[in-house]
């Protein structure tokens, strides 16, 4: 099982941060490989999201489901099929960590665990003569880079401007 855990300080209160991470439909703004998100549900526990990805010569729809919500501290999800993966966003109040010119802050955690070797080879339309093992080898190192980009872009969206976001890496594949 591989795991990515990143955190950063967001210059907003936990409620504001939570409302942004809760809205999966905005995620294509944060991940260029994510083309579209469709929802079946009201955003609560049990809501299912189809996330349409395209990268290189591959297209894939990840079918996810919200498994837990403890607003404004936590939102958990899992993939329903094709690969063993689950994750969560955690938000902790961090007002004492706010810079002097910022009213308050929160620490945002992105935490995902996945087993790339559980991927269903029939779920992805692979180009001719390309093996699933090769695709896993190509995608695996990119997942961490994409997670960093998503968190940075999410912070810019929450705060309304781009800034140099310091990420703390708690765990990454190979660590």
Model-derived regions: residue spans:
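Beta-strand/loop substructures that line and gate deep hydrophobic ligand-binding cavities in soluble
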Residues: 79-148, 156, 165-167
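Charge-rich (especially acidic), low-complexity segments
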Residues: 163-175
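Hydrophobic ligand-binding cavity/cleft-lining segments
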Residues: 1-44, 173-175
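Short beta-strand micro-motifs enriched in acidic
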Residues: 40, 67-69, 90-96
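Hydrophobic pocket/interface hotspot
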Residues: 16-21, 27, 49-51, 66, ...
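Short, hydrophobic/aromatic-rich segments at coil-to-beta transitions
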Residues: 42-50, 69-77
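Short, surface-exposed coil-to-beta transition loops
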Residues: 3-5, 59-63, 84-88
């Amino acid at each position: 099982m591989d795991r990515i855990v990143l955190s950063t300080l967001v210059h907003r209160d936990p409620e504001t941060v939570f409302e942004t991470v809760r809205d999966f439909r905005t995620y294509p703004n944060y991940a260029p490989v994510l083309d579209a998100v469709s929802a079946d549900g009201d955003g609560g526990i049990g809501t299912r999201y189809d996330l349409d990805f395209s990268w290189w010569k591959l297209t894939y729809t990840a079918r996810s489901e919200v498994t837990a919500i403890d607003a404004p501290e936590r939102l958990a999800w899992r993939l329903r099929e094709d690969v063993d993966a689950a994750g969560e966003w955690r938000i902790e109040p961090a007002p004492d960590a706010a810079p002097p010119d910022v009213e308050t802050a929160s620490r945002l955690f992105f935490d995902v665990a996945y087993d790339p070797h559980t991927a269903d080879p029939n779920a992805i339309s692979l180009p001719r003569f390309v093996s699933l093992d090769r695709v896993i080898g190509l995608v695996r190192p990119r997942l961490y880079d994409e997670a960093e980009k998503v968190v940075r872009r999410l912070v810019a969206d929450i705060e309304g401007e781009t800034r140099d976001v310091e990420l703390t890496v708690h765990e990454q594949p190979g660590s």
